[in-house]
């Protein structure tokens, strides 16, 4: 579904991404993990078209820059960290409703179906208690729950998520991953994660990054064993067993 070929990116003299290549198959749930500053979010920004890819990122075999943005947005939903910039007099449902924008007819209001989808998604993702509340009175975690619901409101084929669990408590963190698991039954997920236990438990493929490079990729059980992760993050670890495999839980 997504293919990246020889993707490089630099700002001034600094190389951010260094000749990255990989493929994500349709129906997979792929995590991107690595130390802070290794380029995970930048990589996701290229896939989501927030940054130019110069014929290095392909969706269903076609370079993404040649796909009309509105058409791309109908199939690819994005949840990014920078989304916390949502401000103003907006209410919770307004944020989630924005996920239906690619389907809205020009100069027309959102349809009754759009509003029904918003309520359904807010219920399914646990965001319904926020319905009717103004954004300016919400915490970072509450805003994150809305941005997650907004992404699901697009009903995408491909879901791109940049550290969606960071501001969530344990209850909502696990609820999100279970919802992603259900979505994964009919869609494709690429997710940046710092929580290795969640990566091991829920993702079937992993891409490991360090200093702008991909140093390993493949089935999660093969690339996320405790010894490898300990060397990557340079921290003590302990073993835990998940489906008869050893992983680094931290």
Predicted feature residues:
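Catalytic Walker B motif of ABC-type/P-loop ATPase nucleotide-binding domains
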Residues: 159-163
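ABC ATPase nucleotide-binding domains
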Residues: 226, 230-250
């Amino acid at each position: 579904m997504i293919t990246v070929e020889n993707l490089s990116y630099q700002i001034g003299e600094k190389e951010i991404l260094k000749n990255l290549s990989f493929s994500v198959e349709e129906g997979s749930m792929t995590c991107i993990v690595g130390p802070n500053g290794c380029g995970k979010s930048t990589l996701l920004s290229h896939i989501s078209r927030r940054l130019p890819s110069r014929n290095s990122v392909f969706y269903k075999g076609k370079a993404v820059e040649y796909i009309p943005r509105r058409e791309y947005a109908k199939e690819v939903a994005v949840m990014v960290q920078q989304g916390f910039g949502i401000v103003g007099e907006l209410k919770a449902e307004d944020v989630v409703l924005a996920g239906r924008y690619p389907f809205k007819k020009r100069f027309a209001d959102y349809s009754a179906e759009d509003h029904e989808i918003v309520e359904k998604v807010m219920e399914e993702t646990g965001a319904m208690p926020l319905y009717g509340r103004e954004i300016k009175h919400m915490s970072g975690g509450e805003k994150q729950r809305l941005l997650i619901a907004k992404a699901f409101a697009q009903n995408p084929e491909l879901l791109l998520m940049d550290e969606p669990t960071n501001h969530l408590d344990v209850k909502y963190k696990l609820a999100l991953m279970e919802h992603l698991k259900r979505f994964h039954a009919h869609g494709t997920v690429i997710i940046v994660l710092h929580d290795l236990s969640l990566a091991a438990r829920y993702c079937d493929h992993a891409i490991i990054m360090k200093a702008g490079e991909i140093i390993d990729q493949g089935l999660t059980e093969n690339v996320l064993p405790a010894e490898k992760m300990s060397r990557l993050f340079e921290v003590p670890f302990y073993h835990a067993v998940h489906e008869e495999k050893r992983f680094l839980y931290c």
